[in-house]
Design a protein with these regions (language model features):
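A carboxyl-terminal module marker
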Residues: 2-169
Length: 169
């Protein structure tokens, strides 16, 4: 991927589409690979095993190839993915009731991994939460040195009824 419209989250979305199709749950950890832009790359882990990386190519590396646009790359070990694949389709009842989405932005220290925040949300025991995703990470003067704002989307639903605001607050 490349260009002004491409970003880390678009690339991550492509990878997550593959993981969803294979019934795999990925965890993303900050990558230290030297050819990836610091803070814009992630190692991909599934089942405690690193199966690849994704992220923005470091601008110095792109410049070595006379490329002046942002470049994004991913490498995944397909043999490892297929070995981890749970196989078989998993079916569950669709809810007849509308899901409720909530967005939340949290200012955290730069060293807090967004993937760890998603894992904490998913393991929180929130009764009706069906997904937690990071959709933006902002760094800037308004946030402060050594800090970042992580924006997350949470989806809540029930197969038996419409949820109230109190149930998802």
């Amino acid at each position: 991927m490349y260009g002004a419209d491409a970003d880390f989250f678009a690339l991550k979305g492509v990878a997550e589409g593959l993981f969803d199709a294979l019934h795999l749950k990925a965890v993303y950890r900050a990558s230290s690979l030297p050819f990836l832009h610091p803070g814009r790359g992630a190692d991909v882990e599934i089942g405690g095993k690193t199966v690849g990386y994704l992220g923005e190519i470091h601008p110095d590396v792109a410049a070595d190839y006379d490329c002046d646009v942002r470049l994004y790359a991913a490498e995944l070990d397909l043999d490892a993915l297929f070995a981890l694949c749970k196989g078989g389709a998993e079916f569950r009842e669709f809810s007849k009731f509308p899901p409720v989405e909530r967005d939340l932005a949290v200012v955290v220290a730069e060293n807090v991994a967004a993937g760890d925040m998603v894992a904490a949300a998913e393991n929180s025991g929130a009764e009706h939460m069906t997904s937690a995703e990071v959709f933006d990470v902002y760094r800037g003067a308004q946030i402060g040195e050594g800090m970042k704002s992580v924006a997350m989307n949470f989806t809540f639903s029930s197969v038996s009824r419409t949820l109230t605001d109190e149930e998802i607050a």
